Amino acid sequence: MLALRKTLLHGRLPAAPPAAAAAAIASRIPALLRRLSSSPGDGQGGDEWGSSWSTGITKEHFDGSDAAVGRPVTSPSKPVSPELAAVRAMDEEDEIFRAMERDNREAKAYVDSWGDRMRETCELLKQVREPGSRGSYLKDSEKQEMYRLHKEDPETYTVERLAKDFRVMRQRVHAILWLKEMEEEEERKLGKPLDDSVEVLLDSCPEFFNSHDREFHVASLPYKPDFKVMPEGWDGTTRDPDEVLYEISMKEDQMLYEEFVQRLQFNKKKVAGEVKCHKYSRRRPDDGWTYMVEKLGAQSKRGSGGGWKFASLPDGSSRPLNDMEKMYVKRETPKRRRRIMAPFK
């Protein structure tokens, strides 16, 4: 095969066999065909060619007038010119180049698509581990409707109901209501509506953002074995892991919600100027400071397990703590739990 390929490329064929050798080969062909034949001839020295089909070889194969089965064979009597050989070589090279270019295009498209594949995989894994992270955008028109309903009937449209109706977290409802309240106060001061061109643009092009869909907190549990000594007579049944995860998630969500409300109330008072944070604004009053005193309990305990707190006035009298002071005390109370952090944040 290698010699034939070199022959086709260079246009040179081997020399024809001598005439004597060709005559000897031709004289042996009838005897060979007679052996290959499955049935004898007619007794007159003739050969029956029809039965030789069982061998897959016909007379034309030996005469050189028929091509081999399934592949063309170039006759030695037709020499290949150098021009034809060069054209065939160029065609083969062009075919190789076209195959290489096609493979390069396919490989480049495959490599370029890896960025989108990785982003899609990251989003899918994020939804699997924390399904509540899908809620990422809420239209301004929906925020306006939320604030209008709460302002008209706050007892009916509570924070819990608005969070359930609009399928968002309660923390977002608190933030949206406070934001719309501040915008309404600012419009009242300016005497004209605020510029809402950005909000209108976002509402008119929602395809650029992910729609909100049932925000909720999902706890991140440690993946490690938990060995327990079960009581005698235990039937071998355990709780569903999804049920345990749901209960823990609800407890953590309630704790996060309470902390958010406390911080939001503090920020509201801070924005209103009721909380003084600057060091030069905390000057000693003319009549003296008011101190908070904590009385220890029976077993010298502090906090909820011990005594109680009250305010000591400069004149020596005392009074219970007001709402502002209670808020300060609650913010200073340490939270005896691990820090709750949402994954992928």
From Swiss-Prot:
Protein name: Protein GAMETE CELL DEFECTIVE 1, mitochondrial
Compartments where located: Mitochondrion
Domain of life: Eukaryota
Coiled coil: none
Pfam families: MRP-L20 (PF12824)
Region (Disordered): 36-81
Entry's Gene Ontology cellular component terms: mitochondrion
UniProt keywords, alphabetically: Developmental protein, Mitochondrion, Transit peptide
UniProt GO BP: cell communication; embryo development ending in seed dormancy; endosperm cellularization; endosperm development; gametophyte development; mitochondrial membrane organization; nucleus localization; pollen development
Originating species: Oryza sativa subsp. japonica
Residue stretch of the organelle transit peptide: 1-43
Function statement: Essential for fertility (male and female gametophyte functions and development). Required for the integrity of female gametic mitochondria. Involved in embryo apical-basal patterning, and particularly dorsal-ventral patterning, during early embryogenesis, and endosperm free nucleus positioning and development as well as early endosperm development, probably by modulating the expression pattern of related genes (e.g. AL1, MYB3/AL2, CYP78A13/GE, PNH1, HAZ1, MPK6 and OSH1).
Disruption phenotype: Normal vegetative and floral organ development, but several defects in reproductive organs such as reduced pollen production due to abnormal microspore development, aborted seeds, reduced endosperm nuclei divisions, abnormal distribution of free nuclei missing an oriented positioning at the micropylar end of embryo sacs, and interrupted aleurone differentiation associated with unusual positional endosperm cell differentiation.
Bilayer-spanning residue ranges: none
InterPro entries, sorted: GCD1_mitochondrial
Tissue: Expressed in roots, stems, leaves and florets.
